[in-house]
A protein has these predicted regions:
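Charged heptad-repeat coiled-coil "stalk" segments of single-pass membrane proteins
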Residues: 119-122, 162, 175-177, 184
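Bacterial Sec-dependent N-terminal signal peptides
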Residues: 1-27
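Helix-turn-helix repeat elements of alpha-solenoid scaffolds
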Residues: 157-163, 194-199
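A short, acidic, amphipathic alpha-helical segment used as a generic capping/interface helix at domain edges
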Residues: 166-172
Length: 248
């Protein structure tokens, strides 16, 4: 009887440490129908920094779903093959996803609400950049030279890129104490062809608390990029994207 009680308590304890999540998604993108989606979380152990697929599903008539348990809140990513589709916070409970041509939205839980608001703002800037590209192509088609198009549109493009960077920096620094800040910073690092400290990364790292830099994956990236904290004797040993381009 005591042995049964022990295993019952152990089972209850394990249940308390994990949470159940259910994701229901809708997509208006015809290109996703019939495609297999993968739910991927970061791999914090081992030398490889690749993500781990914890679930998969097929999009049928614009609908898809994931479900399972997770030990702790995590920022996961949904992939179509090797192509990133969107992030989602696995924070337990029922999560609803909407994917269309203009944005991706997530509802269900405070962190997902915060993430969805950020993604909506980011999508507005991305759409403006896309419109600039269309305008550039139209001007070139109508006989404008590349130099004329650049002179006309580059100031607006630069302004949009600055706004995107500020939005991303603010989002990360406002969420340094939860999975959103850590996870989105790591998503930005994945966009680099190799570990390097860009000006944006330096800005974030220098303003973030030490606990942020101690995150296993962030710490691993900083070491690979040659980052040295500002308080160290030789901070100039950190590699930056500008210095790499100058060497080339």
């Amino acid at each position: 009887m005591r042995q049964i009680s022990f295993f019952l308590l152990l089972l209850l304890g394990l249940s308390a440490c994990s949470s159940q999540y259910n994701i229901d998604g809708n997509s208006s993108l015809a290109c996703l129908d019939g495609k297999k989606l993968y739910l991927r979380v970061p791999k914090t152990k081992g030398k490889a920094a690749n993500g781990v697929n914890i679930d998969s599903c097929v999009v049928v008539h614009g609908r898809f779903s994931f479900g399972g348990t997770i030990d702790s809140i995590a920022l996961a990513e949904i992939y179509v093959g090797d192509q990133h589709l969107m992030p989602v916070v696995l924070e337990g409970g029922q999560l609803l996803l909407q994917v269309d041509n203009y944005a991706q939205t997530i509802t269900g839980g405070p962190l997902n609400d915060r993430l969805s608001e950020f993604m909506t703002q980011r999508a507005r800037f991305d759409n403006e950049l896309w419109e600039l590209d269309r305008t550039a192509n139209r001007l070139l088609y109508n006989g404008k030279t590349m130099a004329q198009v650049m002179s006309l549109l580059e100031p607006r493009r630069h302004d949009l890129l600055q706004k995107i960077e500020l939005l991303e920096n603010t989002f990360i620094l406002d969420n340094v104490n939860n999975v959103l800040g850590e996870g989105y910073f790591l998503m930005l690092t994945e966009q680099q062809p190799f570990p390097v400290m860009t000006k944006q990364f330096l800005t974030i790292i220098e303003q973030a608390p030490a606990s942020f830099r101690r995150h296993p994956l962030i710490h691993r990236y900083l070491l690979a990029a040659g980052y040295v904290p500002a308080a160290a004797e030789k901070p100039q040993t950190a590699k930056t994207s500008d210095s790499v381009s100058q060497k080339k």
